[in-house]
Swiss-Prot record:
Organism: Arabidopsis thaliana (Mouse-ear cress)
Keyword Glycosyltransferase: yes
EC number assigned by the record: 2.4.1.-
Keywords for the protein's UniProt record, in alphabetical order: Glycosyltransferase, Transferase
Enzyme class: transferase
Keyword Magnesium: no
Descriptive protein name: UDP-glycosyltransferase 76E1
Described function: Possesses low quercetin 3-O-glucosyltransferase and 7-O-glucosyltransferase activities in vitro.
Length: 453
């Protein structure tokens, strides 16, 4: 990296949410290993701690940014719009101060696509900027397509039950109802977000936490449409592991797993944002119990409306779960998926969880909640054929059957073979001369060109 001269610092700007923080910190680890200094610019909400895992990183907090109470009061979309409004000026000050203190050493600013306030600062200081997408390439394609649809016509289509089950033109095998809309706000708001992020996009390049062995056609579409270099350098959790959980992990579950039979356990975790009604949790508990399979269940505090944790659930729930299950508030997910006792993963299908499950060779039960999770679930079931998707209302019979299909049936055995094959391809992609390894090297070389042209 000596040839980079003094421009050896990369500034990272993450969205303050678990699913966005984790991959951008992994990206930071990967770039640090290439000889760059890393500065992470955070908001006051969900700040990453400067732990031993990131002791070589420099952390800055944008003054006056929003807090957790603002998120609760505004909701996710208004929060995001306001965050971009109020952070623009303070981020400019932050970058200006960095340039002054560090001797003009910034090679580029890498920002999460939803933190588009970064663009004003990089334009003012004439810095290279790189957009980082934490979702699949296919979900990125969907957002790009949706940013250009006729909003009025699309809203009518989405409200028509006859249309929602139809395949969306040009996005096979995705249906209208699989598109990345949100459970956290009206469709109009999500379309506005997509429009804002696309219209303001002036980045010199795009980094995606994916790999060509999973999404070659979507990556090719993006490379053609975006007209800037696209670098698929994932899966980052394999290429550059970097623990960055915003919740405390309960490691006692690993001891419980040690007592279970190989490939027998269903691991259930619905991510850091999904909410569940009591009736759905009871149907899950009954179905899991009736499947006669042991299960490890992550129930996140606050995920049950009106309850801090599980205390508001009926006694029947605790009895059902205690017979063959184990509940924790949060788990060390990659270690759990890697454990030989785990035979399946019931997931919300967030992109990080999807990559982690494939990366450990674990087939999935898919229950998407919002956004790009629906895209991922459809691909898991129909394209990669390593998942069983649960659609519609949950009932114990459907749950029991899904577990049986995954753990006991020949269908599940075939899924396991396919996911192990994908696991091997993912691992190969991040090794020397693999596609993602080479893509990261190409990105580093492009930074040299950005700073010496």
């Amino acid at each position: 990296m000596e040839e980079l001269g003094v421009k050896r610092r990369i500034v990272l700007v993450p969205v303050p949410a678990q699913g966005h923080v984790t991959p951008i910190m992994q990206l930071g680890k990967a770039l640090y290993s290439k000889g760059f200094s890393i500065t992470v610019v955070l908001t006051q909400y969900n700040r990453v701690s400067s732990s031993k895992d990131f002791s070589d990183f420099h952390f800055l907090t944008i003054p006056g940014s929003l807090t957790e109470s603002d998120l609760k009061n505004l909701g996710p979309f208004k929060f995001l719009f306001k965050l971009n409004q109020i952070c623009e000026a303070s981020f400019k000050q932050c970058i200006g101060q960095l340039l002054q203190e560090q001797g003009n050493d910034i090679a580029c600013v890498v920002y999460d696509e939803y933190m588009y306030f970064s663009q004003a600062a990089v334009k003012e200081f004439q810095l290279p900027s790189v957009l980082f997408s934490t979702t699949s390439a296919t979900a990125f394609v969907c957002r790009s397509v949706l940013s250009r649809v006729n909003a009025e016509s699309f809203l009518l289509d989405m409200k028509d039950p006859k249309v929602s089950d139809k395949e969306f033109p040009g996005l096979h095998p995705l249906r209208y109802k699989d598109l990345p809309t949100s459970a956290f706000g009206p469709l109009e708001s999500i379309l506005k977000v997509y429009s804002e992020t696309v219209n303001i996009r002036t980045a010199s390049a795009v980094i995606i936490n994916s790999t060509s062995c999973l999404e070659s056609s979507s990556l090719a579409w993006l490379q053609k449409q975006l007209q800037v270099p696209v670098y698929p350098i994932g899966p980052l959790h394999i290429a550059a592991s970097a623990p960055s959980s915003l919740l405390e992990e309960d490691r006692s579950c690993l001891e419980w797993l040690n007592k279970q039979k190989i490939g027998s356990v269903i691991y259930i975790s619905l991510g850091s944002l999904a909410l569940m009604e009591t009736k759905d949790m009871l149907e899950m508990a009954w179905g899991l119990r009736n499947s006669n399979q042991p299960f490890l269940w992550v129930i996140r505090p606050g995920s049950i409306p009106g309850s801090e944790w599980t205390e508001s659930l009926p006694e029947e729930f605790s009895r059902l779960v205690s017979e063959r299950g184990y509940i924790v508030k949060w788990a060390p997910q990659i270690e759990v998926l890697r454990h030989p006792a785990v035979g399946g993963f019931w997931s919300h299908c967030g992109w990080n969880s999807t990559l982690e499950s494939i990366g450990e060779g674990v087939p999935m039960i898919c229950r998407p909640f919002t956004g790009d999770q629906k895209v991922n679930a459809r691909y898991l079931e129909r394209v990669w054929r390593i998942g069983v998707q649960l659609e519609g209302e949950l009932d114990k019979g459907t749950v029991e059957r899904a577990v049986e299909r995954l753990i006991m049936d020949e269908e599940g055995a075939e899924m396991r073979k396919r996911v192990i094959n994908l696991k091997e391809k993912l691992q190969a992609s991040v090794k020397s001369r693999g596609s993602s390894f080479s893509s990261l090297d190409n990105f580093v070389n492009s930074l040299k060109m950005m700073n010496f042209m």
